[in-house]
Amino acid sequence: ESSPLDFKIEGSQPSRVKATHIANAANLARRAGFNELQFVKDISPRLGEMVKVLFGLAQPSFSNPLQRPSFIYIPELTSKPFYDIQECEGLKSWIQRLQPFKDELLDIGKVSKSKYVEEFENLPNLEEWNKLRDEWLSTHLIKGGEHSEVFKSLSEPLREVLERAPLAHCPPHAPEMFVSVLEPGAYIPPHYGISNCKLTVHIPLKVTKHASLKAGDEIFKWENEQSAMIFDDSFLHSAKNESDEVRIVLIFDIWHPDLSSLEKEGLAKFMTKFAVWNNGVGKLANLDTQLRRK
């Protein structure tokens, strides 16, 4: 008898027997993932609820209708689009240590060539997104917790500062750190991030008051290059640069300030285990969904 791994959902409508095998394989894959990951329920009830929502055993109870993370949703975390720097432990003092190195980071932005849009999955084939491919450029310093070759080429003092950044360390989900360049007139259409366990920080390298970001129903506008922007990208958000100069910022992930140390450790372990499952038996988890679309 064929293994579920041999099933291919192609061609004609599968028979009822084959459909049953496919559904069983998907259910077994989901069960394996749930059993492997529900250890987080012993860390906190809200992490246990997170796993139930992820595997479709509970419906998410979003605190705000404009918040819809596509991957991980942890209930009972403070839900608001923007945060003050004082709410994020250690961030203000770290940014002060970064100030002397802004020119070095700005130089990276001036030669950035990578199309950041290509980092997204399942983007709609819309003119706004296609146009953005040449207008939103980037250079990664850290991706999935791994240092890039560009990071390794930085001056030793800057590397030391970046290595002490208060990042949300839960690879391969996070952290990400990159220099982001938005060309004059560029517009990033509204979209949701993938989790609410972390916040996104923008450190200005070259900004103008005509560059802004909207998250939820609030808008942040740059007033000067000494400020920082912290927002929850699980909210619907968009950005635009209405000036005639490029906007260049350093972007990175930090933990949501409501999470305890134990929850952060649990999430780091969770992301590692999820990646193993997702790249293995987890590939079968959506077979029945694909079948229903046929």
Question: Which residues are covered by each model-predicted region?
Answer:
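Conserved metal-binding segment of the jelly-roll/cupin
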Residues: 221-236
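Residues in well-ordered beta-strands of folded domains
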Residues: 140, 178-180, 204, 214, ...
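A short beta-strand-loop-beta hairpin characteristic of the jelly-roll/cupin
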Residues: 205-224
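Extracellular structured ligand-interaction cores
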Residues: 98, 174-176, 185, 198-202, ...
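Short beta-strand His + acidic residue motifs that chelate non-heme Fe in jelly-roll/DSBH
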Residues: 188-191, 211-213, 231, 237-243
